[in-house]
């Protein structure tokens, strides 16, 4: 999980080009600096960690989805799955005592939004248990095709709003009646 920062990074630099690899390192350094210097209420890694603990321990939610709406990020959920679940998938403390008083981490899943929104989104929208979701979309597309990115952004925002607000059965029935589909 940390090997890209070591000598193995050479193979990555060769594959993506030194300038791209250097840009990755600059981004990592910027995030490290943000983590070290940002006030807690603005510290993105701290806020994300606290949300994870809150969902896991307070709400007893033991699953989490990462949905990038960009094909260049389609492997990000698998990478995060390995990083997070391997790190947190422990049942024994450093002193060899069994962990019994808290869950060590959620099951993480996901995939590229356009690929997975017709597979497990039914569970996200209508399942009986909540699933925290992080939607990711770049501000600017690397492959701008007409209005495709604008449409994709609208889709992501609509998915997020639907999950955030939802509808009661009465609201859904009223919408169907208003559309003449009762």
Question: What is each PLM-predicted segment?
Answer:
Residues 1-146, 166:
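Active-site phosphate/pyrophosphate-binding segments
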Residues 144-181:
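Acidic, Ser/Thr-rich peripheral helices and adjacent loops at domain boundaries
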């Amino acid at each position: 999980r940390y090997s890209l920062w070591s000598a193995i990074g050479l193979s990555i630099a060769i594959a993506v080009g030194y300038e791209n690899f250097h840009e990755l390192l600059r981004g990592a350094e910027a995030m490290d600096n943000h983590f070290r210097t940002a006030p807690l209420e603005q510290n993105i890694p701290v806020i994300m960690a606290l949300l994870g603990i809150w969902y896991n321990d307070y709400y007893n939610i033991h699953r989490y989805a990462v949905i990038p709406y960009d094909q260049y990020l389609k492997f990000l959920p698998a990478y995060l799955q390995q990083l997070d679940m391997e790190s947190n998938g422990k049942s024994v403390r450093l002193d060899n005592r069994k962990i019994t008083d808290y869950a060590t981490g959620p099951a993480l899943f996901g995939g590229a939004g356009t690929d997975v929104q017709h597979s497990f989104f039914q569970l996200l929208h209508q399942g009986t248990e909540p699933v925290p979701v992080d939607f990711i979309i770049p501000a600017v597309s690397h492959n701008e095709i007409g209005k495709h990115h604008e449409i994709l952004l609208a889709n992501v925002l609509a998915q997020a709003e639907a999950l955030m607000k939802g509808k009661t059965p009465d609201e859904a029935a009223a919408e169907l009646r208003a559309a003449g589909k009762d």
